[in-house]
UniProtKB/Swiss-Prot annotation:
Belongs to the TACO1 family. One of its GO terms (biological process) is regulation of DNA-templated transcription. PANTHER family: TRANSCRIPTIONAL REGULATORY PROTEIN YEBC-RELATED, TRANSLATIONAL ACTIVATOR OF CYTOCHROME C OXIDASE 1. Coiled coil: none annotated. The lineage of its organism: Bacteria, Pseudomonadati, Pseudomonadota, Betaproteobacteria, Burkholderiales. This is Probable transcriptional regulatory protein Bxeno_A1185. Keywords: Cytoplasm, DNA-binding, Transcription, Transcription regulation. It is found in: Cytoplasm.
Amino acid sequence: MAGHSKWANIKHKKAAADAKRGKVWTRLIKEIQVAARMGGGDIDSNPRLRLAVEKAYDANMPKDNVNRAIQRGVGGVDGASYEEIRYEGYGIGGAAVIVDTMTDNRTRTVAEVRHAFSKNGGNMGTDGSVSFMFDHVGQFLFAPGTPEDKLMEAALEAGAEDVVTNDDGSIEVLCPPNDFPKVKSALEAAGFKAELAEVTMKPQTEVEFTGEDAVKMQKLLDALENLDDVQEVYTNAAIAEE
């Protein structure tokens, strides 16, 4: 099945993440702490923690930092205690936006998120106002030129639900969130290393943005992404590359 062009957007996302590595590490440390607190410090029995640790190593985080975050999560080291809060809202033209945060001060966080929306042409919604427009999935993205038939066979054997070939030749593999670690391991064992592998909120349909509207929408997304308490920002806005 065909899909939208993804490759340029993914490369942009990876480059932006690399440029903000310090912020990426801060977000990953929070994720490790919360995952360890909720599911324990053993990565073999805690899939969420295992995924967070893998992301940390992919971002070149030192092992000592990872271990400290795990210990802080299970209570072995003093530190701030974070809670997860999701906010939903609308951007330019009613585009749907989900903002996942981890915070030790929800009053501060909601004020900052609301300000970012209102200052950049958007507005906060209520719980559930836009999340129904997204699917919670495991997503793998492979570069154009990846052998499609072999990847599809390996993905479906691993338990993937869908394999999507995009207009630019990149290939997406989608799976249930709980199966993400299993599918990731199986694909890697078959010789397929994804350029992007994550559990995400994937929009069911996308709204195309071009020109000035694209600039305004990107400004809103950047403002949200740059907030210290924000972990992830999801949107159904497809912003055209310049």
